[in-house]
Amino acid sequence: WSQNTGPAVADYMLYKSLVFAAQNLDSETFKKYKASFLECVNKQKSPSILVFLTAEVPYLQNQIKKRGRSYEQNIEDAYLKKIEIGYKKILETELPFLVLKIDAATYDFKESEQGFQHLLRKIYSAKFL
């Protein structure tokens, strides 16, 4: 990654750590975490584009159940909604990369070749090159 000089596509956003930290840390600890996080993230190379999958809470709950991780089974809708709001706040800020939002419920990228091809077309047609 550090050697790459061309465009890079990411499906993971370091900033997501801030979203979860805001929900799980007390305000004083979060302030310290955020300051340290921003210092570190500013040293990282940014992707050219971030593929950000969006989904409504019922879809997320269904995916959580399908994944079957015992520690996730009791996640409440309200918590997922707070996480969604946190993501929206970050995505509304000026980020150093293009964000391509894709509704995860529209296409099955994992099981459907057609869905996967649709995702690839969206990425390649984005203006990030």
Where are these regions (language model features)?
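Conserved nucleotide-sensing/catalytic segment adjacent to the nucleotide-binding pocket
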Residues: 1-7, 12-14, 20-28
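Short, flexible, glycine/charge-rich loop motifs used to bind or transfer phosphoryl groups or to couple energy/partner
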Residues: 3, 39-42, 90-91
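Short amphipathic alpha-helical segments, especially helix-boundary/capping motifs
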Residues: 10-15, 60-65, 96-99
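Short loop/turn segments at strand-loop or loop-helix junctions that form parts
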Residues: 10-15, 54-55, 103-105
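A glycine- and Lys/Arg-enriched "phosphate-lid" helix/loop adjacent to the NTP-binding pocket
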Residues: 17-86
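NTP-dependent small-molecule kinase module
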Residues: 65-73, 78-129
